[in-house]
Amino acid sequence: MQHRSFFLLALVALLAVTTAVAKKKDKVKKGSECSEWTWGPCTPSSKDCGMGFREGTCGAQTQRIHCKVPCNWKKEFGADCKYKFESWGACDGSTGTKARQGTLKKARYNAQCQETIRVTKPCTSKTKSKAKAKKGKGKD
């Protein structure tokens, strides 16, 4: 009699486990029906950079996924637009800046990115960079 009870209990437990697994597979299939997701920008949880969330929609479905905005990103391009940059050009004496151009390498999450961009930065003298390099190595 005890063997029958044990066998019946084991059979019920096995049935419960297989039912739970089948339900989980159905959930995965329902979520994967959508193939055209539209993703918004990564919005940091605090300040301008760091961990945040990105919202995506597909039909009536909405998802939020974790994402990260690098702290060295340039706001004018967006964190999801990746560019390949040329070398810095010569220093323009009239403006005191040098420039370089970047061409779009990758647009993540269907981001709207410019094909080419131009960035500038102030010119620096060679002596300053050498002094910083020496200071960083512990030589004064």
From Swiss-Prot:
The protein's predominant localisation is: secreted
Q: Which InterPro entries match?
A: Midkine_heparin-bd_GF, PTN/MK_C_dom, PTN/MK_C_dom_sf, PTN/MK_diS_sf, PTN/MK_N_dom, PTN/MK_N_dom_sf, PTN_MK_heparin-bd_GF_CS
Which PROSITE patterns does the record match to this protein? PTN_MK_1, PTN_MK_2
What keywords appear on the UniProt entry? Developmental protein, Differentiation, Disulfide bond, Growth factor, Heparin-binding, Mitogen, Secreted, Signal
S-S bridge residues: C34-C58, C42-C67, C49-C71, C81-C113, C91-C123
- Listed SMART domains: PTN
One Pfam family in the UniProt entry: PTN_MK_C
Query: Tell me, which GO biological process terms does this entry list?
Result: adrenal gland development; behavioral fear response; cell migration; cerebellar granular layer development; cerebral cortex development; cytoskeleton organization; defecation; dentate gyrus development
Q: Which SUPFAM superfamilies match?
A: Midkine
Q: Where in the cell is it found?
A: Secreted
Q: Which Gene3D superfamilies match?
A: Heparin-binding Growth Factor, Midkine, Chain A- C-terminal Domain, Pleiotrophin/Midkine, N-terminal domain
In its UniProt record, a GO molecular function of this protein is: growth factor activity
Q: Which GO terms describe its cellular component?
A: cell projection; extracellular region
Concerning what turns on (or off) its expression, the entry says: In arteries 3 days after injury. Expression continues to increase until day 7 after injury and decreases slightly by day 14.
List the signal peptide residues.
Answer: 1-20
Report the protein's function: Developmentally regulated, secreted growth factor homologous to pleiotrophin (PTN), which has heparin binding activity. Binds anaplastic lymphoma kinase (ALK) which induces ALK activation and subsequent phosphorylation of the insulin receptor substrate (IRS1), followed by the activation of mitogen-activated protein kinase (MAPK) and PI3-kinase, and the induction of cell proliferation. Involved in neointima formation after arterial injury, possibly by mediating leukocyte recruitment. Also involved in early fetal adrenal gland development. Secreted protein that functions as a cytokine and growth factor and mediates its signal through cell-surface proteoglycan and non-proteoglycan receptors. Binds cell-surface proteoglycan receptors via their chondroitin sulfate (CS) groups. Thereby regulates many processes like inflammatory response, cell proliferation, cell adhesion, cell growth, cell survival, tissue regeneration, cell differentiation and cell migration. Participates in inflammatory processes by exerting two different activities.
Q: How does it assemble?
A: Homodimer. Interacts with ALK. Interacts with LRP1; promotes neuronal survival. Interacts with LRP2. Interacts with NCAM1. Interacts (via C-terminal) with PTPRZ1 (via chondroitin sulfate chains); this interaction is inhibited by PTN; this interaction promotes neuronal migration. Interacts with NCL; this interaction promotes NCL clustering and lateral movements of this complex into lipid rafts leading to MDK internalization. Interacts with LRP6 and LRP8: this interaction is calcium dependent. Interacts with ITGA4. Interacts with ITGA6. Interacts with ITGB1.
Query: To which protein family does this belong?
Result: Belongs to the pleiotrophin family.
Task: From the Swiss-Prot or TrEMBL record, give the protein name.
Answer: Midkine
Q: Please tell me the species this chain comes from.
A: Rattus norvegicus (Rat)
Which gene carries the instructions for this protein? Mdk
